[in-house]
Every structure is written in C-alpha cells, then in structure tokens.
C-alpha cells in the first residue's frame, strides 16, 4: 500500500502542523490507519530507494523491522505500525537527502513523527471503515489523556493507547482490477493448476531416466467440477486459498512525562510498547513430481532434493511403472502463519541552557521483536516415511496422526535493537548583516544489532522446499555533526553542515551539505541545496547471514528461442520453472554514496497565495544490489561474470540430447542460483516538485485550494559500473515508475463544518518490448494487445471526499470516502498474482471511514 496515495500527501521540507481542532487530528489519524494492508510499511514518494529513507520518532531513530526480505536479502525496512498514531502531533518530511543532525545514511530523506507536547485534557475516539462490498473492514479505538501544565505545575504527563483490528480478505473477494475477466487476466477464476486434490500422474519420457514429464489420463476419482477432459488432468484454482489481505490486530500504549526541574533544566522520559499480530492464510502444501522436484538447503549449505514419485506396487500408483505426481495436500488444510511483532522504546532526555548554549542529551533504547509461528510445509522425514510405508493415501482418507506428522508447526524469531547516547547544543555566535549566525553541533554514540533465528528443524533442512534465514550481527557507529546558519546579507541566508561517522565494521565518512536562500523580492525567494550521503551496507548484507528464496526463471540454454524447448527439454524451460536462490553475504562491499541537488523558488504574491517549485536530482553510486536469478542464468557462460553461479541437474538422463540422442553434458535443468550482493552501477534520478496553494473567503467561510505534483523527468539506471544507462521513467524496464503523480484538494471550513474534495492522479507507464513479436510485453497469460487496447498500464484517477462536524458539545464527527467513483486499479500484466501494482494502486475501490471523537476538556 502506498502511504502517500492512500493516506494523503505529506509536508514539504517544512512541517505539517496538527490542526487546532480535534476533527483535523481525527481525520489525519483515520487516514494513517488505512495504511495497514501490509504489516511492514516503507515510505517513499520519489524514486523507489525504499531502504534509503530514515524514519524517526521525535527526532531519534526507530529500530527497523526484525525481518530479512527473502526476495532481496535485505533487512532495513520499517514497520510503521509500531508508531502510536493517536499520539502524533505532526509529521516532518525532509526530502533533500541526508541530514547532518539526523544521519548521513538518509539518502532518500527523513520522515520524523513528532509526538504531542504539553497536552492537557482527554479524548477517546472510535473509527471504522470498509469498501462498498463490505470487505477490507477495519476498526480502531484510541484514547489520549494529558495532565499537568508546564507553565503552572512544571510537569506534564501524556498517556495514549490504541487498538486496531482488520478483517482478512480472500483473494477472489474484491473486484479489484479493471478489465476484470479473471480467466484472461492472470487466470484468477480458472481451473489452471494441475496441483490438485486428486493426484495427476506422469510417466518418464524415457523409461529409467528419472524425468517424469509425460502426462497420463485423468484420474477417474477427479470430481466432475474439476475435470477439464479425460487427458488434461484433474484441476484446481490455486487462488481459492489465497488472501489479498491478512487478518490483523494491533494494540499499543505510550507514556511521556516532562518535568521542569528549574528555569534552565527540563527532563523528559518516554516509554512505549506496541504489539501487532498478523494471521495469514495461504494454499495447502503442494508437491511436483515433474521436472527437478523440490530443492532446498539447510543452514550449512547441504542440498536436499525431493521428487514426488510413487514406485510400482504403491496402492496409489495404478500403473505398472513408476509415476511422478502433481498433488495438493488439501487434507492438511490451508497454510497458516501467525506473526507477532513487538516494538519497545525507552527514551530519557535532559534539555537546558548552559554557558549560552541550548543543550540536550538523551539515552535511547529501541527494539523490535518478531515471533512467527507457521505450518503448511511438509516435514521431510515424515514425508519420506509416509511414502515408503504407504501410511499416507494420495487422494484418499488419512488419519489425524499422519496429517499431524506431515504438517507440524515451526517457529522463527527475529530481533533488532538500537541503543544510543547523544549530546546536542545550539547557540547564536555573532552578528551578520542579515541577523545572528547560529550554530548547532553534537555527538552520537550508537549500537545496532540484528538477529534472526529460524526453527531448528528448518535450519536442519527438515521442511520441504522452505528457505532458512539466519542473521547475527552488530556494530557501533560514532558520529560528530555540526550545522551553521549564516544570514550573510539581509536577503541572503546560507547553511553549512557536516557530519562525520565512524563505523566499527566500515570506513569513516565525512558528508557535507550546503544550502542557500536568496530573497530576491518581498514576494520571491530562490533557494538551492547540495548534499552528500553515505550508507554502509546493512548487517544482513555483510554479516554471518544466509538468506534463501525461490524464483521463477526460464532457461536460455534449454529454450533459446523462448518458445520451443530443445530435444531433451520440456515446456517449463520456456514458460518458467521455480528454482532455489541463496543469498550469501559479501564482506568486501563498499558503502553507497550519493549526491543530491535541488534548485527552486517560493513565490508568494500575497499571504493567501503561494507557488513552490523545485528541480531536484539524486545521484547514487556504488549501489548495493544483486542480480536477479534470471540475470545470473542469462549470463551463465559470460566470461568473468561475477553476478552469481548456476547449479544444474547432474543426472545425464535430464540433459539435452543431440540429434542422435546423445546427452549433452552440463545442460540439465537449472536447480539453484547462488547470488551475492555487489556494488553495481549508478542511479541518476531527476524530477520536479510543485506545490500551489491559495485561500480566500466565501459565504462566511474559508476556501483553501492546494495542488501537489511530482514529475519524474528521468530515472537513469546503470546495472554495472561502466555500463550503459537505461531510463526507467514511464516504463516497466526497471521499477515500473510513473512519470507524474499528484493531488489537487479543495477544502471549505465554516463554523462547525469542514469539508474537502481531493483529486488523485497516478500516471501510467508503457510496456513496449522490442524483444517480443508483438512489440508489447503482456505477461505470462494469453492476453492479446487487441483485448487490452493499449500497450501500457493506464493512468489512475480517483476522487476522495470528507467532512467533519464539531457542533455537538465535545464531539467531533468525521467521515472520509475515498475513490467515490469506485474506479478499479489498472491492470498490470507484470503482476501475475495480484493483477495490479501495489506500489501505486490498491484493490479497495470505493471505501469509507467514519470516526467519532469525544473530548473530556
């Protein structure tokens, strides 16, 4: 779920102030609470440098999620569900790169959540929402109380608690995608899977070669509803079991106390705890006896391979020769995963004045813990025993004891921690023609750790086809920073900043930043910024870690023309086969470095009208990434290729053959790719941000108009150092990036009423592909260009409306309806499971949220 599209735009390089009326806060919180379709959220408005944006709470770091993404091997994303939303006063967003004060690793900027200060009173709120189809339901209850007046009582205590719940949504429930003919769009409503509850049998292509890829007649036990023909096999719709949104609930509390010890010394303590629980259901386990079977590795790197075959004489083998099976273990039930994420945070701070300095020092401890309990993966020792002793009947009735032995629960844990001590100070230095020069400086000592432990049985390799992720690492970072603000002329102000970081596991880094603002006219200010950033590799990329995943790939060796396999190959060489991938750490990685530039102006002809425009550019080099499994396979025989290695089946019976039927060594099906993180090429991104605001009086009320837009001029990506740059803006080659995104909002406030209407726009991107015959990439289904009517993902426009009312004493009523026209997400042929791109679109259609807040003031 894209935070900025679903939940409204954030502030620019300034602050979003919390509205003074309770209704504004209720609406902001309601919007934020809609952003929980995924348990782990990352925030990004510009290019997808998702893991390069720094998230802060009250100006200090938040521990990242205790999760290593098995698809990327990376482990530095943030779970924003752990932040107590009802206690938030405003959100600061710094978009111009790294910050000397906050951190040089914020290549893509900073998001800073600021808690309420000196709050007095109490309020309780309830909210709920759903779509028109009454799915994607969510409910929230929150309460906030504050007592003590700093000015009078010299103390203040803030208490905040919140509970959130959402219902699960089956994959086929929402009518989520345009052109919603599921049989043609990703085959979501069709019996396309031959992994069925009744086994489908396959014989060897050549007796004794161990390659089971010749289909046999459909089992007569197959129900009529699942039978396509006498030879097409028993079928299933794999989407029957999948959820597009998991069920979840979250509860959290925060306590913040502030006390003035004297006129020059103040103490603050914060304590927060949040628990988020997700329950996810997926398809029952399956096994495939065709191809190379299931391949996986244990923690030590030992390879396992299981091919689902039945010998002659097995009661479920009706043939006089060995057979391979494609089978869905439906009697084991759906796969169930429960994830519990706990986030704890303790902060103790002192602020005061000393020797002409405003001084602040603090100790921070931030921790996230993840416990995952899951089943739905076959227990290898029990599976081998069940096949050998015939205790499991394929397509028959099985005992509870056998089912339990095949499908035990497993548990994995993860933990990340950040602890730091810092000292900051600021003061005015001397007089300049434009005012007083001011200096801010400080030091920070920080320790980071990341640990992931998989279930011991999983580490040993005792679950069929499941990846084992293990991480254990820590490091310290010591930093010095300073920032000087110098109004050198009455209409010219400069800012100079520098930060020095020393990593225990990496080199030191010094990153400067420079800013200039020139007030050319009373109504016009021109500004420019230059900054550098430094991001050391994450702990999962360099430490004693091992991350495994699975990828679907085609094989250019066995299917060089992309459509017809060579002799000895099979159809999956062309259409795609699932292979294992192993990510190994790279201790020689160099840090990423970036430079950012921005130039813009602020034009304010009156106090009611303003126009801001910024041209920005980010250049990132030494980018840490890995080649995809497909890229590794495509370059298997490229001299000097360092992207990874390919491991193929070594059984000569699986090799390609010559015209005379002689096996060709080294041409077996791909089983595994071994990949490492590398310092690859460079990314250069350039765009324009626009912000137009105007307000005026009308009918005794006030109208506010606001338009925000980001235009991506270029997204140049260089895969390897010295290689060619490819522009990914507006196409699908790199990250499926639209060129234009924006909103236009009109709001009207009068008396107790406040309402708004907002227009949202997300541009499309093309799918032109010169490597295919049609010239247009259409995914892996039977779509035709004529059916879609264009070679692109369409642009998406939606309209939101909202209103709030404060006319009832102490009550605030608010309602928001998003996508009032019920426009479905545009179809994306590259998203073969969802059918839409979750980075920019959502499956909600028209959806509403209502809230009631009662204030005890």
Can you say where each PLM-predicted feature lies in the sequence?
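Short acidic/polar hinge/loop motifs at secondary-structure boundaries
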Residues: 44, 60-95
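N-terminal periplasmic accessory domains that precede
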Residues: 3-11, 79-81, 105-126, 141
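Short loop/turn motifs that connect adjacent beta-strands in outer-membrane beta-barrel proteins
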Residues: 83, 118-121, 150-155, 261-265, ...
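Extracytoplasmic beta-strand/coil segments of soluble accessory domains associated
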Residues: 2-65, 102
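Surface-exposed, low-complexity loop segments enriched in small/polar and acidic residues
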Residues: 70, 167, 175-184, 211-248, ...
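Non-catalytic regulatory/gating segments with a bias toward low-complexity or hydrophobic composition
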Residues: 7, 91, 111-113, 124, ...
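C-terminal beta-barrel architecture of Gram-negative outer-membrane proteins
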Residues: 144, 549, 705-806
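C-terminal beta-signal and adjacent terminal beta-strands/loops
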Residues: 66, 610, 713-714, 759-776, ...
């Amino acid at each position: 779920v894209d935070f900025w599209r679903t939940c409204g735009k954030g502030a620019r390089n300034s602050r979003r102030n919390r509205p003074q009326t309770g209704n504004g806060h209720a609406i902001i919180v309601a919007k934020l609470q809609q952003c929980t379709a995924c348990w782990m959220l990352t925030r990004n408005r510009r290019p997808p440098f998702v893991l390069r944006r720094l998230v802060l709470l009250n100006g200090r770091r938040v521990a990242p999620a205790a999760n290593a993404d098995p698809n990327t091997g990376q482990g530095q994303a943030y779970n924003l569900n752990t932040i107590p939303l009802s206690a938030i006063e405003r959100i600061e967003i710094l978009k111009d790169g790294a910050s000397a004060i906050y951190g040089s690793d914020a290549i893509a900027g900073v998001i800073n959540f600021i808690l309420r200060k000196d709050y007095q009173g109490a309020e309780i709120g309830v909210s709920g929402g759903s779509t028109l189809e009454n799915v994607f339901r969510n409910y929230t209850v929150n309460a906030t109380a504050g007592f003590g007046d700093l000015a009078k009582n010299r103390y203040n205590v803030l208490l905040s608690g919140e509970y959130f719940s959402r219902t699960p949504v089956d994959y086929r429930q929402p009518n989520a995608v345009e052109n919603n003919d599921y049989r043609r769009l990703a085959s979501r409503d069709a019996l396309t899977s031959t992994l069925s509850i009744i086994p489908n049998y396959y014989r060897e292509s050549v007796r004794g070669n161990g390659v089971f890829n010749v289909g046999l007649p459909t089992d007569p036990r197959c129900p009529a509803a699942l039978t396509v023909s006498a030879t097409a096999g028993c079928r299933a719709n794999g989407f029957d079991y999948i959820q597009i949104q998991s069920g979840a609930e979250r509860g959290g509390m925060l306590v913040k106390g502030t006390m003035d010890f004297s006129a020059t010394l103040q103490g603050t303590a914060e304590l927060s705890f949040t628990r988020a629980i997700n329950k996810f259901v997926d398809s029952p386990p399956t096994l495939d006896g065709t191809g190379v079977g299931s391949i996986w590795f244990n923690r030590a790197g030992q390879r396992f391979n299981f091919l689902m075959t039945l010998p002659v004489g097995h009661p479920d083998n009706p043939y006089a020769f060995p057979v391979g099976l494609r089978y869905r273990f439906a009697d084991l039930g759906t796969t169930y995963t429960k994830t519990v994420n706990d986030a704890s945070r303790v902060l103790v701070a002192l602020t005061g004045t000393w020797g002409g300095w405003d001084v602040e020092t603090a100790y921070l401890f931030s921790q996230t813990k993840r416990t995952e309990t899951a089943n739905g993966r076959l227990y290898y020792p029990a599976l081998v025993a069940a096949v050998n002793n015939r205790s499991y009947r394929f397509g028959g009735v099985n005992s509870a004891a056998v089912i339990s032995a095949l499908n035990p629960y497993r548990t994995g844990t993860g933990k990340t921690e950040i602890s730091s001590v810092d000292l900051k100070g600021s003061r005015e230095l001397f007089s300049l023609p434009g005012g007083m020069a001011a200096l801010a400086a400080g030091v920070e000592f920080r320790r980071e750790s990341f640990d992931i432990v998989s279930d011991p049985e999983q580490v040993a390799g005792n679950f069929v086809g499941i990846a084992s992720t293990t991480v254990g690492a820590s490091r310290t970072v010591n930093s010095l920073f300073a920032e000087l603000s110098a109004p050198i002329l009455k209409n010219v102000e400069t800012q100079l900043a520098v930060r020095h970081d020393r990593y225990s596991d990496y080199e030191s880094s010094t990153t400067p930043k420079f800013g200039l603002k020139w007030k050319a006219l009373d109504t016009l200010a021109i500004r420019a910024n230059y900054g550098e950033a430094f991001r050391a590799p994450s702990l999962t990329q360099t430490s004693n870690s091992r991350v495994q995943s699975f990828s679907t790939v085609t094989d250019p060796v066995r299917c060089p023309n992309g459509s017809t396999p060579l002799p000895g190959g099979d159809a999956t060489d062309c259409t795609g086969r699932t292979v294992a991938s192993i990510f190994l750490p790279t201790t020689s990685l160099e840090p990423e470095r970036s430079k950012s530039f921005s130039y813009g102006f602020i034009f304010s002809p009156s106090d009611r009208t303003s126009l801001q425009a910024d041209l920005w550019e980010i250049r990132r080099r030494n980018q840490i990434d890995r080649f995809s499994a497909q890229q590794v396979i495509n370059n298997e025989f490229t001299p000097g290729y360092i992207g990874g290695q390919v491991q193929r089946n070594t059984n000569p019976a699986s090799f390609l053959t010559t015209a005379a039927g002689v096996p060709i060594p080294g041409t077996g099906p791909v089983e595994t790719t071994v990949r490492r993180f590398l310092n690859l090429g460079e990314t250069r991104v350039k765009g324009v941000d626009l912000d137009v605001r105007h307000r005026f009086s009308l009918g005794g009320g006030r109208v506010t108009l606001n338009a925000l837009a980001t235009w991506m001029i270029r997204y140049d990506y260089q895969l390897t150092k010295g290689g060619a740059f490819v522009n990914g803006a507006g196409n699908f080659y790199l990250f499926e990036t639209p060129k234009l995104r924006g909103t236009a909002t009109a709001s009207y406030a009068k008396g107790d009423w406040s309402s708004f209407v907002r227009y949202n726009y997300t541009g499309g991107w093309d799918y032109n592909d010169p490597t295919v015959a049609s010239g247009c990439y259409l995914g892996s289904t039977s779509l035709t260009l004529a059916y879609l009517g264009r070679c692109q993902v369409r642009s998406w426009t939606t309209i939101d409306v909202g209103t709030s009312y404060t006319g009832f004493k102490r009550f605030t009523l608010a309602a928001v309806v998003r996508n009032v026209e019920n426009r479905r997400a545009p179809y994306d042929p590259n998203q073969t499971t969802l059918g839409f791109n979750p980075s920019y679109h959502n499956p909600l259609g028209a959806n509403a949220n209502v809230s009631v807040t009662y204030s005890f003031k």
